[in-house]
C-alpha cells in the first residue's frame, strides 16, 4: 500500500497494533491529528495516563511531519462540510474528521 493519511484513532493505537501490514507503506498524519493528540495529556486526570499520552505525543512529533491545514484544505473543508450538511449530518460532531478529510482531498 503506498502513502496514506492515518486517522487520529489509528495513530493513537500505533504502538498497540499487532499487524501493521494494513497500514500504508508511508503513513502520513495531519496537523489536525497532532492537535487532537496534544489535548490528550492535558485532559487526563490520572498521572500515569497523562504520562503515557505525553510520551506518545512526543513519539508522533518526532516521527511524523504533519500535513498542514492550509488554504487548499480550507477550500476542501467547505466541500466536505457542505456535503455532510446536505446529507443531514451535524458537522460539529465531525469537525476534526472533516478537516482531516479536507487535507486528504487537497493533496490529491
What are these regions (language model features)?
Residues 13, 39, 59, 76-79, ...:
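Residue-level signal for well-ordered alpha-helical scaffold segments within enzymatic catalytic domains
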Amino acid at each position: 500500500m503506498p502513502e496514506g493519511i492515518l486517522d487520529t484513532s489509528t495513530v493513537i493505537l500505533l504502538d498497540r497494533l499487532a499487524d501493521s501490514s494494513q497500514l500504508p507503506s508511508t503513513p502520513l498524519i495531519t496537523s489536525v491529528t497532532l492537535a487532537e493528540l496534544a489535548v490528550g495529556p492535558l485532559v487526563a486526570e490520572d498521572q500515569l495516563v497523562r504520562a503515557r499520552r505525553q510520551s506518545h505525543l512526543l513519539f508522533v512529533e518526532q516521527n511524523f511531519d504533519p500535513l498542514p491545514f492550509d488554504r487548499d484544505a480550507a477550500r476542501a473543508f467547505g466541500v466536505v462540510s457542505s456535503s455532510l450538511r446536505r446529507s443531514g449530518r451535524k458537522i460539529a460532531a465531525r469537525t476534526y474528521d472533516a478537516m482531516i478529510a479536507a487535507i486528504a482531498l487537497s493533496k490529491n
